[in-house]
């Protein structure tokens, strides 16, 4: 199980992602965050969110895995975005350490 990579001010974890109706399984997505931005890279294509564009980060449970739903205000991205990972507790702890609110 992959632990989130940490440096002085970032958290990063590999996983899978759902973007609207599209689904990419592990290991084809990576979520990286610092104190100001959240970046979800899916199959090499980045989705970048500023703190202001993130409306809510919420932990959720799927059939098999757990994930982080990203509610956002960016009209260029699909409305439904979920990052699936194996260690949601470590991810949410890292995000909270950086000042992100996760419900």
Residues of each region from the PLM?
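Short, surface-exposed beta-strand/loop "edge" segments at domain boundaries and coil↔beta transitions
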Residues: 2, 40, 47-48, 75-83
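Canonical pleckstrin homology
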Residues: 28, 60-85
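Phosphoinositide-dependent membrane-docking surfaces
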Residues: 38, 48-62
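Anionic N-terminal interaction surfaces
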Residues: 1-32, 73, 89-93, 97, ...
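Structural motif
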Residues: 30, 37-39
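Residue-level recognition of conserved beta-strand positions in structured domain cores
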Residues: 42, 51, 70-72
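A short, sequence-level motif marking secondary-structure junctions
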Residues: 52-56, 82-90
């Amino acid at each position: 199980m992959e632990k989130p990579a940490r440096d002085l001010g970032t958290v990063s974890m590999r996983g899978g992602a759902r973007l609207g109706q599209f689904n990419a399984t592990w290991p084809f997505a990576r979520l990286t965050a610092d104190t100001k931005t959240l970046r979800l890279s899916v199959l090499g294509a980045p989705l970048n969110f500023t703190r202001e564009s993130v409306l809510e980060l919420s932990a959720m449970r799927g059939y098999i895995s757990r994930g982080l739903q990203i509610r956002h205000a960016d009209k260029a991205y699909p409305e439904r975005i979920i990052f699936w990972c194996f260690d949601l507790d470590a991810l949410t702890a890292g995000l909270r350490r950086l000042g992100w609110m996760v419900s």
